[in-house]
Amino acid sequence: MKAISVLGSTGSIGTQTLQIAEEFPEQFRVVALTAGRNLKLLVEQVQRHRPEVVALADSDLLPELQERLKDAGVTGADAPQLVGGADGLNVAAAWDSADLVVTGIVGCAGLLPTLAAIRAGKDLALANKETLIAAGPVVLPELKKSGSRLLPADSEHSAIFQCLQGTPWAENARLSTGVPTPGLRRIQLTASGGAFRDWTAADLEKATVADATSHPNWSMGRKITVDSASLMNKGLEVIEAHYLFGLDYDHIEIVIHPQSIIHSMIELADSSVLAQLGWPDMKLPILYCLSWPSRLETPWRRLDLTEVGQLSFRAPDPAKYPCMELAYAAGSAGGTMPAVMNAANEEAVAQFLEEKIHFLDIPTVIEAACERHKPDLMAQPQLDDVLRVDQWARTAVREQVNRGVTRLPMGAIAA
């Protein structure tokens, strides 16, 4: 039986991970949970899974959680150890009895707990892509030092990882080196196109929060759904793929695939192309992380290509998706630039969700932060440098929003 810790248990990745644990009680045991402010759901999770430790990001909520657990009958030997704050999250992430840590905390907030798990030698199911995007130069040496294995829990990188299992370089694809995988020529990341894939560039002028958070294929959190609509999510995945598999950015491509059946493809040295297919369901890549290197039989819906009918593909329009171009540029710049770009995007999306800026303002404020950072870019940052520029970028975006955003004309960034 594999003991798992779930960081961000009340979020989209966390809840689906716990559903899998319930479906396979003889395979997985939950030993640690961390959460934000959804105490009602967290108490229900504790009742069902009986973890050894529970951590809250906000330590001020610990007394309320303790009372809620008591009212729910979780007392005495059944009660988990409760810890809070940043230190508490790190304690849960490095929990001694855990074999695998699922990192489902959204955004750069997941960086420090992920590093704590790595330094404790834990294997990771990485759903928090921002960890590598913002701090790849910091994380990769830590992985090498600890011997932790990093398995991708998002659908695209899981697809690449699964395809590599069918090559002679499978052992080299444990995702802990960041060096080029031999024989891997090209990666093609598939994108649904998000909520606005069938909108024209002109239509985006009337985009609302409700529009941007209505994904046609996937069930995900609000922030990542907005990132999907802007194609920033795919741009972030390009940077993550660079760190995971070691390919240069010129060899990592994005292709829009509206059906979301092919989850990504790899091209090998002999020009063969391998792909992983399945219905758009995040539980599949999460399960593979939990069960790897084995595969578990499931009663889940099986793929029927005759039901799908056809698979279509098209190139993304850089003028319509300027965030994609910003991600490529930040990744190519390297150093602290991806951290600045990622933090600026997180803050810009938060401002959009609060209806303080328009959807089309998101790339404008991101680009402004990246431009301001260019003179101060650090090529070989340490952890403190990453955390510092992360906070700087968030502040820069808020200040720009408060001053008022002068939107760039459509296509200006791509040009």
UniProtKB/Swiss-Prot annotation:
GO molecular function terms listed in the Swiss-Prot or TrEMBL record: 1-deoxy-D-xylulose-5-phosphate reductoisomerase activity; manganese ion binding; NADPH binding
Residues binding Mn(2+), per UniProt: D154, E156, E237
Highest rank taxon of the organism: Bacteria
Top EC group: oxidoreductase
GO biological process, one term: isopentenyl diphosphate biosynthetic process, methylerythritol 4-phosphate pathway involved in terpenoid biosynthetic process
SUPFAM superfamilies: 1-deoxy-D-xylulose-5-phosphate reductoisomerase, C-terminal domain (SSF69055), Glyceraldehyde-3-phosphate dehydrogenase-like, C-terminal domain (SSF55347), NAD(P)-binding Rossmann-fold domains (SSF51735)
EC number: 1.1.1.267
One Pfam entry name: DXP_redisom_C
Obligatory cofactor(s): Mg(2+); Mn(2+)
Swiss-Prot/TrEMBL catalytic activity: 2-C-methyl-D-erythritol 4-phosphate + NADP(+) = 1-deoxy-D-xylulose 5-phosphate + NADPH + H(+)
Pathway field: Isoprenoid biosynthesis; isopentenyl diphosphate biosynthesis via DXP pathway; isopentenyl diphosphate from 1-deoxy-D-xylulose 5-phosphate: step 1/6
Cited InterPro entries: DXP_reductoisomerase, DXP_reductoisomerase_C, DXP_reductoisomerase_N, DXPR_C, DXPR_C_sf, NAD(P)-bd_dom_sf
Ligand binding (1-deoxy-D-xylulose 5-phosphate): K129, S155, E156, S192, H215, S228, N233, K234, E237
Entry keyword set: Isoprene biosynthesis, Manganese, Metal-binding, NADP, Oxidoreductase
Function: Catalyzes the NADPH-dependent rearrangement and reduction of 1-deoxy-D-xylulose-5-phosphate (DXP) to 2-C-methyl-D-erythritol 4-phosphate (MEP).
Database matches in HAMAP family: DXP_reductoisom
Family label: Belongs to the DXR family.
Protein name as catalogued: 1-deoxy-D-xylulose 5-phosphate reductoisomerase
Organism whose genome encodes this protein: Synechococcus sp. (strain CC9605)
